[in-house]
Amino acid sequence: MEMASAFTLNVRLDNIAIITIDVPGEKMNTLKAEFASQVRAIIKQLRENKELRGVVFVSAKPDNFIAGADINMIGNCKTAQEAEVLARQGQQLMAEIHALPIPVIAAIHGACLGGGLELALACHGRVCTDDPKTVLGLPEVQLGLLPGSGGTQRLPRLIGVSTALEMILTGKQLRAKQAVKLGLVDDVVPHSILLEAAVELAKQDRPSSRPLPVRERILAGPLGRALLFKMVGKKTEHKTQGNYPATERILEVVETGLAQGTSSGYDAEARAFGELAMTPQSQALRNIFFASTEVKKDPGSDAPPAPLNSVGILGGGLMGGGIAYVTACKAGLPVRIKDINPQGINHALKYSWDQLEGKVRRRHLKASERDKQLALISGTTDYCGFAHRDLIIEAVFENLELKQQMVAEVEQNCATHTIFASNTSSLPIGDIAAHAARPEQVIGLHFFSPVEKMPLVEIIPHASTSAQTIATTVKLAKKQGKTPIVVRDKAGFYVNRILAPYINEAIRMLTEGERIEHIDTALVKFGFPVGPIQLLDEVGIDTGTKIMPVLEAAYGERFSAPANVVSSILNDDRKGRKNGRGFYLYGQKGRKSKKQVDPAIYPLIGAQGQGRLSAPQVAERCVMLMLNEAVCCLDEQVIRSVRDGDIGAVFGIGFPPFLGGPFRYIDSLGAGEVVAIMQRLATQYGSRFTPCNRFVEMSERGESFWKTTATDLQ
């Protein structure tokens, strides 16, 4: 049976051809290699019909134009040459669209990304909707690739080289108003008239490319170009620390096209695409993409979730305010906040106001939409309005008795079906539910700060939590825009448990004489977004170290931190960024204020600050402990799979994405190599580096954590 076509042609009475994109059986339109013959058949018909005045590409999907190319095509390539051929085929198809003698217009609604934007760039004009769902971008760099169907050549010529480089190097997505301002699209219209607006544009002569701003014209010239690429290259190297080869190749390919012409540019683009597709960095980043997609589809349990119509939140502090924001503004659910005083409620409301007002100022949101979203949030100092809430999220202080009291109050004041979800970061959920009348409806829901930015949540059922409670909580997390992993109710759960030994080792090296900036720089060079010492400052030293005694009590000496260091710092009223002094000093709020290491730290903790370790040695000590703890968590079934372990580390603490997560990284090194490194470190520095039994057994058997499956790139 022949598969239905993803591209269909209809010719209107006014001789405008409408090409409708609708990939059968898929929510999102993605481009596949087999579609090329369909498009070419349509192009042939267009060329044969001499009556046609213009062509419009439009999507039949409700919320996307084309979300990109099907990434599985790249995974199916075994060599750089095969991937290069894939790119050249894409370039050729786009060239054939562009070569049509009549105006070709893209009518864009929803996501227009990657190969979708490259198709739109091959058209002679573009019209998009003013809908918030409409975004345009080239995110290939986030998969360790570059745009391979002409995007590196067409975009700089359309909007200017400096603006194009920013888009391609960062994967930045533009909203409609930004796109029209930059000249990426010709017009922005309401969704209701998108097709007619595109048709009207198609009836005119080909839209002439508008002149670039003077600055962009200067930067495209030989002198300006040399200066621009030198500056951007330096900035990019600092940002990526040389860990992402795609950025270097993007600069090279764009510059080639500008200096030597589009023919050379397209050739360089295809070759670079093929080579990048075979890099371990791209394979790791694509694996993370596939894993996160799978996690987002995972319901958490086999039971059907309960209905979710409204949510309550206990506590209007930083976490409570953030949770209220994502619940109302991302999930679209009514939220009722309870706090013991009105100031707490005001704080939570202001949190959402600040987030939404920022969007209004950046013109990402209309004022009317801001007001509509804010209207979903209300507050109270008692349980008024809580009687019929489907799920309550508790975000009060880390105190077991207080949280147990919250459970009792919710059971007394809410419906019998209400779920109680605790945002605890360290207390066992089983203990919180110990005196509950309905323990099957108590669960952990651990958000990370800042709530609106951190993509991960940990969902923690205790022994008596029902399958439906798990499924309902997972459902809420997804509606909030989060990536949820279900973890076992053991001290530290997963993310904090693998993070603690990593930070402890950094503090221990500090006491041994390593300098703060050397430790942090070493881990940033390794690939983390910030170093462990700075991370502790950002989280809050008082908050970040609170969990350490809990973990040491649960797991023993390998979690012991240099107690004198922590106590000395806290006794000196150093809490980190939040009070302006921690390991670093922070200037007054403002654009020019920069953090700097406080030299007073060294005498305070009795350290010399004259280190002997190289950056790789520093990174090795911190990272090996994290890897070992991740394997311990898998062995103890704290995480359900290596997939969840990799996603939890990358999304929860910024484990370098280009390494694919702890388990992918172990597989790339080989379990035997990692065990040998840890045994050497154990001899040098102590028993905390002793590899866990599962690690040793896998090493002896030559096994890897990730097994080859249909969806797994090896």
From Swiss-Prot:
Disulfide bonds: none annotated. Residues 306-714 are annotated as: 3-hydroxyacyl-CoA dehydrogenase. The keyword Cytoplasm applies. Pathway: Lipid metabolism; fatty acid beta-oxidation. Residues 1-190 are annotated as: Enoyl-CoA hydratase. One of its GO terms (molecular function) is enoyl-CoA hydratase activity. It is found in: Cytoplasm. It comes from the Bacteria. It catalyses: a (3S)-3-hydroxyacyl-CoA = a (2E)-enoyl-CoA + H2O; a 4-saturated-(3S)-3-hydroxyacyl-CoA = a (3E)-enoyl-CoA + H2O; a (3S)-3-hydroxyacyl-CoA + NAD(+) = a 3-oxoacyl-CoA + NADH + H(+); (3S)-3-hydroxybutanoyl-CoA = (3R)-3-hydroxybutanoyl-CoA. Its EC number is 4.2.1.17, 5.1.2.3, 1.1.1.35. The record marks 118, 140 as: Important for catalytic activity. GO terms for cellular component: cytoplasm. Heterotetramer of two alpha chains (FadJ) and two beta chains (FadI). In the N-terminal section; belongs to the enoyl-CoA hydratase/isomerase family. This is Fatty acid oxidation complex subunit alpha. It comes from Escherichia coli O6:K15:H31 (strain 536 / UPEC). The gene is fadJ.
